[in-house]
């Protein structure tokens, strides 16, 4: 769905909209459900955007009660609260992390945002090494060593240009990161200009310059691809961190070493010989 989903306690702050819920106006929002636990009333709100729900708009193997499950035909019955409404729902929640609607909404947002960072991070870890191995000169192509160049005698030339002197100061870099990223995240979480209510996970507008959300059916499919690749990227980044600690090499060099000598360069061989600090 390309609509805003939020679970809010009456008179409380909505975690997604970031604004006080003082009244419900049918012309602006649709009331999807009223429920609660332990005597607490809970409203589920969605901004009316004119887009149909995923289940109603497409016959997709990734959504609905007949969607693909985590173990295929051997998966068994999914929990009642996993209905296949959202992308990436394979009916698996042994820890019950999605049982509470508010916790589920928060975890959905965290997963998607971290997935996007992981996809960008994985690309940033791999691409410089690939370029360096193909003749492109870098001061330091290995991802976990590159940042330390700012403390070297010559400093760090951003984009290879010594004219960009702000890159020579770690404080200036930190300030730029806080201001720029803070502004973007604030825009996303607060709901855009003038407090307009938007979905913080899929805000659209200027965040969708290619118009990927214009077609609801195609957008539903893109969201599944995003979360699947994002989960893979998060596992990849975890692997890159472990490689950096154990081998002291980047992912491309580790891959090349493994392909050259798979018997001696593999996870089992390193795990059995690894001594912290050496």
Curated annotation (Swiss-Prot):
Residues given in the record as chlorophyll b 5 binding sites: 177, 274
Positions contributing to chlorophyll a 5 binding: 225, 243
Residues the record lists as binding chlorophyll b 1: 70
Cofactor note: Binds at least 14 chlorophylls (8 Chl-a and 6 Chl-b) and carotenoids such as lutein and neoxanthin.
Any one Pfam family match given in the protein's UniProt record, by short name: Chloroa_b-bind
GO BP terms, alphabetized: photosynthesis, light harvesting
Binding site for chlorophyll a 1: 92, 98, 111, 231
Taxonomy, superkingdom: Eukaryota
Cited InterPro entries: Chloro_AB-bd_pln (IPR001344), Chloroa_b-bind (IPR022796)
Transit peptide residues according to the UniProt entry: 1-45
Binding site for chlorophyll a 6: 258, 267
GO molecular function: chlorophyll binding; metal ion binding
Residues reported in the UniProt entry to bind chlorophyll b 3: 169, 185
Intrachain disulfide bonds: none
Its job: The light-harvesting complex (LHC) functions as a light receptor, it captures and delivers excitation energy to photosystems with which it is closely associated.
Subunit: The LHC complex consists of chlorophyll a-b binding proteins.
Name the record gives this protein: Chlorophyll a-b binding protein 1A, chloroplastic
Originating organism: Pyrus pyrifolia
């Amino acid at each position: 769905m390309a609509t805003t989903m939020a679970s809010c306690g009456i008179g409380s702050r909505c975690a997604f909209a970031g604004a006080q819920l003082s009244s419900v106006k049918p012309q602006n929002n649709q009331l999807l459900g009223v429920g609660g636990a332990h005597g607490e009333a809970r409203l589920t709100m969605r901004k009316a955007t004119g887009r149909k729900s995923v289940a109603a708009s497409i016959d997709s193997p990734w959504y609905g009660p007949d969607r693909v499950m985590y173990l295929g035909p051997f998966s068994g019955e999914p929990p009642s609260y996993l209905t296949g409404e959202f992308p990436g729902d394979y009916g698996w929640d042994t820890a019950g992390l999605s049982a509470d609607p508010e916790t589920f909404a928060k975890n959905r947002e965290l997963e998607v945002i971290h997935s996007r960072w992981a996809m960008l991070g994985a690309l940033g870890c791999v691409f410089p090494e690939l370029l360096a191995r193909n003749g492109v000169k870098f001061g330091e192509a290995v991802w976990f060593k590159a940042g330390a160049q700012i403390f070297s005698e010559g400093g760090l030339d951003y984009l290879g240009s010594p004219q960009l002197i702000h890159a020579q100061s770690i404080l200036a870099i930190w300030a730029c990161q806080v201001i720029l990223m803070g502004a973007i995240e604030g825009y996303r979480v607060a709901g855009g200009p003038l407090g307009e209510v938007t979905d913080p996970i899929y805000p659209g507008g200027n965040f969708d310059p290619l118009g990927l959300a214009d077609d609801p059916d195609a957008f539903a499919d893109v969201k599944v691809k995003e979360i699947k690749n994002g989960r893979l990227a998060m596992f990849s980044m975890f692997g890159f961190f472990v490689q950096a600690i154990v081998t002291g090499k980047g992912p491309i060099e580790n891959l090349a070493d493994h392909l050259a000598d798979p018997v001696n360069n593999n996870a089992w061989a390193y795990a059995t010989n690894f001594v912290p600090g050496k």
